């Protein structure tokens, strides 16, 4: 309002003296402006040089951070958890107390390394720090709950799982992960409750329908699963054909299932889940060469949680095809990875005699 009042004030007549005074000021300012421009140009060069040096320092810091992080990951893969902890901490030290997505992800790695190294309390402290930073961090609650579940502290596990579900929003993968954790702990009823929360998340995108169909499939509600998955497919969700194949498989419609698995693999050859499922189906049908091919492809991709199933089926496929040398070699590796599988140990003794 003040600006407007000044702007609209009635102009007064300008005297000749005022005109001359302004001209003198303009002439003086013109001389000064040349000197000022020289100073500005000089300061611009200094500033640009400073920014360039700062940029180089930032690049070096980021490179160091990335290098330490990769060293930590490599150490974990080699079983050197103490080395991994040090590397991840060095990566975090590069951040100078600045917290972003990369730092949070590095903290997850650090906590996993701490737990693997037998430093349970340190891992708990790291997860708790993540929670203190973001009270709605569903992932941190889930991982802390998973730690307590592994330690058979089910009260604390459930407490953190409930908080993870509370803040999961429309993260269907979180609800499914919670179900899987409960299933592993023999708490199927609690796990199903988490799945139901996932259904309640709502949403009408192709991904929403696909994930709800997947959840109904886990709940054994095949009619609703098919309805949701069909809608997702109509909305052009390519991932859904994998879940529909699994639905056909549990319903005993093997031909339909195999067709969808193959169709999915043709477009997504980097998905180990489909490869493991199709490999298992080919094994059951006696198509051993085909089964071996799919299972080896899955293992080459790192089958993750399905690695044990893939490797076990690969051994059976080799054995059934008469390739006992390959079966024995694969079994040697399997028994190292899964020493508590007593059935496999007995099978290994059998293969030793072939």
Task: Specify the residue positions occupied by each region the protein language model found.
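Start-of-helix register in tetratricopeptide repeats
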Residues: 66, 100-101, 105, 139, ...
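Register position in tetratricopeptide repeats
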Residues: 77-78, 116, 150-151, 184-185, ...
């Amino acid at each position: 309002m003040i600006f407007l009042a000044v702007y609209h004030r009635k102009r007064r007549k300008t005297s000749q003296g005022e005109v001359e005074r302004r001209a003198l000021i303009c002439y003086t300012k013109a001389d000064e402006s040349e000197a000022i421009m020289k100073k500005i140009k000089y300061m611009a060069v200094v500033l640009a040089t400073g920014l360039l040096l700062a940029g180089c320092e930032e690049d070096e810091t980021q490179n160091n951070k990335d290098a330490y992080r990769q060293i930590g990951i490599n150490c974990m893969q080699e079983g050197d958890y103490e080395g991994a902890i040090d590397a991840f901490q060095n990566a975090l030290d590069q951040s100078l107390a600045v917290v972003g997505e990369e730092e949070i992800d590095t903290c997850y790695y650090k906590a996993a390394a701490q737990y693997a190294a037998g430093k349970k309390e340190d891992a708990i402290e790291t997860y708790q720090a993540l929670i203190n930073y973001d009270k709605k961090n569903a992932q941190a609650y889930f991982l802390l709950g998973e730690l307590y579940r592994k330690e058979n502290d089910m009260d604390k596990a459930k407490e953190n799982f409930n908080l993870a579900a509370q803040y999961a929003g429309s993260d269907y993968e979180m609800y499914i992960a919670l179900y899987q954790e409960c299933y592993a702990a023999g708490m199927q009823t609690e796990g199903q409750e988490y799945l139901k929360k996932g259904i309640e998340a709502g949403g009408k995108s192709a991904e929403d329908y696909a994930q709800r169909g997947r959840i109904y499939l886990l709940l054994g509600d095949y009619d609703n699963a098919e309805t949701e998955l069909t809608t997702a497919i109509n909305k052009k969700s390519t991932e859904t054909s994998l879940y529909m194949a699994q639905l056909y498989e549990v319903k005993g419609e093997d031909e339909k299932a195999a067709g969808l698995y193959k169709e999915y693999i043709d477009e997504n050859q980097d998905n180990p889940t489909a490869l493991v499922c199709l490999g298992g189906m080919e094994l059951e049908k006696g198509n051993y060469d085909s089964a071996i091919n799919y299972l080896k492809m899955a293992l080459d991709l790192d089958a993750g949680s399905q690695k044990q199933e893939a490797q076990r089926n690969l051994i059976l496929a080799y054995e059934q095809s008469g390739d006992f040398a390959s079966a024995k070699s694969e079994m040697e590796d399997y028994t190292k990875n899964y020493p508590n599988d007593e059935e496999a140990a007995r099978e290994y003794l059998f293969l030793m005699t072939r």
